[in-house]
């Protein structure tokens, strides 16, 4: 399965769980301490990153989704750093600040790419009033399409059963990254994402794929779960659902450098994809591709839609094919930053013919990258009348994406692509026919941004309408 990126800008996700601050100290080591047989690190720089549930929220935001987060913190400097960092990424924070507790902080000392020691500053949050989290959840639920419960067994999800019940009552799916050997508190969840070690800690040693599926189905029935996604390290991941065939996904990791936060990435991409309208199996394929990227990075890491697109389609930009608007905007910025000239055109392209192919080839020669914006079915119907389009949007886009001249294909639902063009801002806007440049939709915006508008001629004797008429007349 090669999934298509959704528009994560349509995804609202609420994250509730154990938030923490990950701190890194970096420096070289050249000697052993005279005080004890340990290396001496000369600290030269440092870094601070949101971790735990906060890393999940960062992942949602980096994809372009709308993340809201609820968690427990202290009233201290790490809490301030967490909030400011997340707010800068447009994550809406609604933390419960408890002065008697420290904000969970993990300090890692790094040298030559290796972690020498980790120091944890934390106390488990216990006996907190469940209403502190539940009321914050109630405020957020009307604004989201998915809920993630990120459990690191630090106390934020002490009342997880009530959180699941409240989300399900609102018909919002609940995705949980579980912790520990007891899955009873997660009863009724939409999906759990245990790794293999966590899964085997609950069900015992797994001897084969069939054994994994059988044991997963047992857990699903016992705890009334919607599904289980077991992440299996070098063996990829397996999605198990009742009354459906298991869905096995091989790993896409090329090099494993650091698995820190990989589980956060899996559940965030999974939930965001479902929130954006993807079916569960396709959302899992996207999450699997994302995991293959982040394990090649150091520490708790996020990924962009560009990195996710490259993981799915390969590193060559020309393989992007069909792409969501938000991902396209990022792709165009990346291409322009490399000095590439981006050309854009648009049309219905209902029945692709030689005239279309010739036109697109000529457009592609004017730059380094070619975008084709395609009218959706409803847009075509408004423009062309009943009976059109002959081919639905997904098929028209798939055919265009298969042309060597075309780099990206993106749909638009309006009568004209003016809004889309004003967001993308290509270097050159091209239109076929006898238009005047100033009359082309989006042309003014492109020119105002320093771009160009150009009109190309269509090949004579090629017309979609004529082809349709010929078929109807039995002459084709």
UniProtKB/Swiss-Prot annotation:
Active-site feature positions: 264
UniProt family annotation: In the N-terminal section; belongs to the carbohydrate kinase PfkB family. In the C-terminal section; belongs to the cytidylyltransferase family.
Keyword Ribonucleoprotein among record annotations: no
Binding sites annotated in the UniProt record for ATP: 195-198
Any single GO BP term: ADP-L-glycero-beta-D-manno-heptose biosynthetic process
Annotated Gene3D superfamilies: 3.40.1190.20, HUPs
UniProt-annotated stretches for the region Ribokinase: 1-318
Record function comment: Catalyzes the ADP transfer from ATP to D-glycero-beta-D-manno-heptose 1-phosphate, yielding ADP-D-glycero-beta-D-manno-heptose.
The protein's Enzyme Commission number: 2.7.1.167, 2.7.7.70
Positions in coiled-coil regions: none
Pathway(s) the chain acts in: Nucleotide-sugar biosynthesis; ADP-L-glycero-beta-D-manno-heptose biosynthesis; ADP-L-glycero-beta-D-manno-heptose from D-glycero-beta-D-manno-heptose 7-phosphate: step 1/4; Nucleotide-sugar biosynthesis; ADP-L-glycero-beta-D-manno-heptose biosynthesis; ADP-L-glycero-beta-D-manno-heptose from D-glycero-beta-D-manno-heptose 7-phosphate: step 3/4; Bacterial outer membrane biogenesis; LPS core biosynthesis
Region (Cytidylyltransferase): 344-476
Subunit structure: Homodimer.
SUPFAM superfamilies in alphabetical order: Nucleotidylyl transferase, Ribokinase-like
Name the UniProt record assigns to this protein: Bifunctional protein HldE
Xref: HAMAP family: HldE (MF_01603)
